[in-house]
Amino acid sequence: MAMRKGKEYELNIEEIEFPSMGIAYHEGLKVYVKHGIPGQKVLARITTKKKDHAKGKIIEVLEDLPYKIEAKCPAFGQCGGCAHQDIPYEKQLEIKQHEILELFKKANLDGFDFLPIEGSPKQYEYRNKMEFTFGDLKKGGELNLGMHAKGMSFGIISADECKIVDEDYRNILNATLNYFREKQLPHYRIMAREGYLRNLVIRKAENTGEVLVNLVTTSQIDFNLDEYTEIIKSINYKGNLVGILHTINDSLSDVVQCDKLNILYGRDYIIEDLLGLKFKITPLSFFQTNSKGAEKLYSIVRDFIGESKSKTVFDLYCGTGTIGQIVAPEAKKVIGIELIEEAVESARENAKLNNLNNCEFIAGDIAQVIKEVKQKPDVIILDPPRPGVHPKALEYVIKFDSPTIVYVSCNPKTLVEDLKVLVENGYVIEKVKGMDMFPSTPHVETVVGLRRKDTL
């Protein structure tokens, strides 16, 4: 009998695809089951039904995996943050390695050295930034501060025992939640467009211990935050509190953005050390959220580039210039291009902080700016956002004829599409290595080393 949307079916998970999408078959029809793991038998409700595939949501696990372990976090299963805390870490790495390789196989990309995946140095308490949301689990319920509940668009579950951040985060969260519960201030409701409390964003530099607390609200209520500031200052920190901020965000979207920034205490940035260099991180600037993992990731990039003393390196989608600056001490010249002006300003500031005189950072759309750059690169580093490299930018990357390209990807699906274009235009994939920056989640970074055919 044909599968129908809304109906429930018993399914055996046989395969897995990125990002942590279990694959089952029903009468020959491929069914994608989110967070299903091969070996499980599940009861799933069909949410989407197309001619060539269906999508299902797990209602119940009927037969589980023999190697499952107990998750450390009491909110696991209810919280939408972590997917695999109940799977041993070695198995998590095995799954991610398999998912990357399968994507390369499907894209008919082969002939490269597929290196073992690198695990995160820390499986727990690894994050240097966390964005918590104010809300309630059920409409009209008690104020919560934490993560979106699993499978719910608006429900928020408190993350007071979150295990992917350290004790300082948990103490700040609990102090904040207790204070605002007592004050009975309303959280922002995105559909009604009303309320005050939006987010609590905490950044903590792993290697320096500097802590920055950022309370995000609307301007709908004029509330004095002096008492709150003193409460946050009075916490017994393992690290070092350097700033408390109040960000006004009246945007209609769910994204944390800044309409106005007030410094309640200290300063509005932290300094992080990575591989002997210093990086200034501002409230909204992008920075890899796993510092110890980032050191490993950037070491892999440096290794893939190889000897670079006489080389000009292009760092495209450079953000705050982290990768470019880490290779700069060994390079002749580094040119970074980034769309976000604030990130470029941070990159320039960081280069000064590190006494690097061979770095130039340009703000603008890569697809446009790349046309105007006169220098010829010996190495191009690509580190694009999830959608991959813009097709126009990729055309210019190819025209530059760089002997070496190192592609750092946070989305292996778009990575393989870009690699197909590079291979069609004279590049050979030499090596591929996964790097797990996000234990217990489906996400994985992939580093790819390419060489132009005529340089081999």
From Swiss-Prot:
Alphabetized InterPro entries for the sequence: MeTrfase_TrmA_AS, NA-bd_OB-fold, SAM-dependent_MTases_sf, TRAM_dom, U5_MeTrfase_fam
Gene3D superfamilies: 2.40.50.1070, Nucleic acid-binding proteins (2.40.50.140), Vaccinia Virus protein VP39 (3.40.50.150)
All copies of domain TRAM, residue ranges: 2-60
Active site, renumbered: 410
EC number: 2.1.1.-
Keyword 4Fe-4S attached: yes
Family stated for the protein in its record: Belongs to the class I-like SAM-binding methyltransferase superfamily. RNA M5U methyltransferase family.
Name of this protein: Uncharacterized RNA methyltransferase CTC_01941
